[in-house]
Each structure stands twice: as structure tokens, then as C-alpha cells.
Amino acid sequence: MSAQQTNLGIVVGVDGSPCSHTAVEWAARDAQMRNVALRVVQVVPPVITAPEGWAFEYSRFQEAQKREIVEHSYLVAQAHQIVEQAHKVALEASSSGRAAQITGEVLHGQIVPTLANISRQVAMVVLGYRGQGAVAGALLGSVSSSLVRHAHGPVAVIPEEPRPARPPHAPVVVGIDGSPTSGLAAEIAFDEASRRGVDLVALHAWSDMGPLDFPRLNWAPIEWRNLEDEQEKMLARRLSGWQDRYPDVVVHKVVVCDRPAPRLLELAQTAQLVVVGSHGRGGFPGMHLGSVSRAVVNSGQAPVIVARIPQDPAVPA
């Protein structure tokens, strides 16, 4: 990654759930590998104020707002306790001497826009995930899926407990399809593999058809071989610059004529980290999270970093 990016810190969002503590541990270790600051945050939504045109209902609204202010005060106090506990988890997951680089903070605002705006100024935002289609907690519910669509930088989604547990030498896996976000994913994946001292598996699944669809094409064997050679050369070209920059990383190239999601899910079962672009072939900046990225995140099989190219437009509330 660029010098500017590697000097930026990491932010982890918490909500007090067990899987958010897992995310804190992962973020603390990643921040330590990068030797950057870690910021533990919880975002508390603001108190709702009376909209215009409610004058005749204002007295009733005042009573509701009083109750909400009391509840909001409780949520703020609870948030401080959650951040304090998460801060302790981060310290325990880090080596001695890191205390000054780990801070905690309660923020006030709409959750997704707040975290998305923070993502402009940090190397990565980290959130926890329960896996198997269930996202944990109020903060980590729709927030995870919304943030990976609106963030201005990488978002790491960490499952509570990858199944089965991965050994320290498990590889990093990256999906490469030629899109701009997969190029950013390659940069992140090489950097992570280098810092972890593990191999990198680069997957290029070059078709959107499944294996059962190909017999209908009636292609000659030489046509298949030529196409496979072309795809292998394409992957080699896209990785060559990164291999020159990270000569310590052993790269295993996997080129298959298949849909990318099933192959990434297969590789994720033995990976310690999967890196994917926020959208792939045919994608464009600002579109919803791609089907491949969504499938890998939802599987909960391994921590996933979703690479997202920064966007200029304001984040919707």
C-alpha cells in the first residue's frame, strides 16, 4: 500500500456483542502489524426533534421527546461502558507498549454517514459479523452492508468464529477480475500477506457460467486451451507489478473457467483472510455491493476485506 495509506490508522466499530469483540481483537492485531493507531468507536444516533408542521401535536411530542432524551442518556452511558470494555479487549490483543496508540471514543450522529466519513481519513474500518446470514447487534446490523456500499476506503468484516479455526500459516486469498476495485484488492492482499508472512492465493474465475453450461458451447479443445492461456497471461500481467513490489510473497495463481463466488467460497474455507473488490466485472463506482462480494461476506467463513475506491459524493443519511 502507499506510504500515506500505511501511516493511517484503523477504526473498529463496536456494539458490545461477542462478535464485535472478535472484530476488536482482529483490528488490534492488524493495527499492530501496520504499526498504526487503533480507534475504537461506538456511534450513538441523535435525539429526534419535532418536524415542522407539528404545532398542534407539539405537547404530545414533548412528552415523547422527554422519554427519548432519558433513553438517549442511557444509551450514551452504555456506549461509554462498551467502548471502555472494547478498549481493554484491544489492549489484551496487542503487545505491550501499544497503549498510547489505542484510543476509544463515543461519537454522536447517524451511524452509516458517520462511519463512512471517518473512512475518508483512515486506512480501514472494521466491523464484526455473526455469519450464516445473521449480522450482529444494532450497530452491526444493516450498518455492515450499508457501510461497504458507501465507505470511502476498505471495510473489513470479521465473523465471530471462522469455521474451522485457521492456522497462522493459512494463506490470504484475493479475487482478481480486471475491475478497478479488484486492482485495489490485489494491493491490499499483497500488503496483508507480506505483513503476515504467508502465501497469497490469487483467483481469477473468468466466466459467469457454471461448469454445466460449457458443453453447450461446442468449442474445440484448441479453442479452450487458447482461451485459458489468454486468461492465465492476463492474471500474470495484473499481478506482476505487485510481485515485484512484494518479492517476499509466494503467489499461487488459480485460473478457472467458472463463476467466481463458488470458487472464492471454496478457498475461503482454508484462508485466514479473503480480499475482494466491492464490485466486479460490469460494476461501476457507487453501485451496490457486488454479488460476489456479498456472497463471500455473508458466508462468514473467514475475515473479509472489501476494497472500495473512494467516492466524492456525500453519503446519504
Curated annotation (Swiss-Prot):
Cross-link (Isoglutamyl lysine isopeptide (Lys-Gln) (interchain with Q-Cter in protein Pup)), chain numbering: 88
Alphabetical keyword list: ATP-binding, Isopeptide bond, Nucleotide-binding, Ubl conjugation
Gene3D superfamilies: HUPs
One Pfam family this sequence matches: Usp
Gene Ontology terms for molecular function: ATP binding
Key word Nucleotide-binding present: yes
InterPro entries for the chain: Rossmann-like_a/b/a_fold, Universal_stress_UspA, UspA
Induction description: A member of the dormancy regulon. Induced in response to reduced oxygen tension (hypoxia), low levels of nitric oxide (NO) and carbon monoxide (CO). It is hoped that this regulon will give insight into the latent, or dormant phase of infection.
GO cellular component, one term: plasma membrane
Entry's family note: Belongs to the universal stress protein A family.
PANTHER family on file: STRESS RESPONSE PROTEIN NHAX (PTHR46268), UNIVERSAL STRESS PROTEIN RV2623 (PTHR46268:SF27)
Annotated protein name in UniProt: Universal stress protein Rv1996
Source organism per UniProt: Mycobacterium tuberculosis (strain ATCC 25618 / H37Rv)
Lineage: Bacteria, Bacillati, Actinomycetota, Actinomycetes, Mycobacteriales
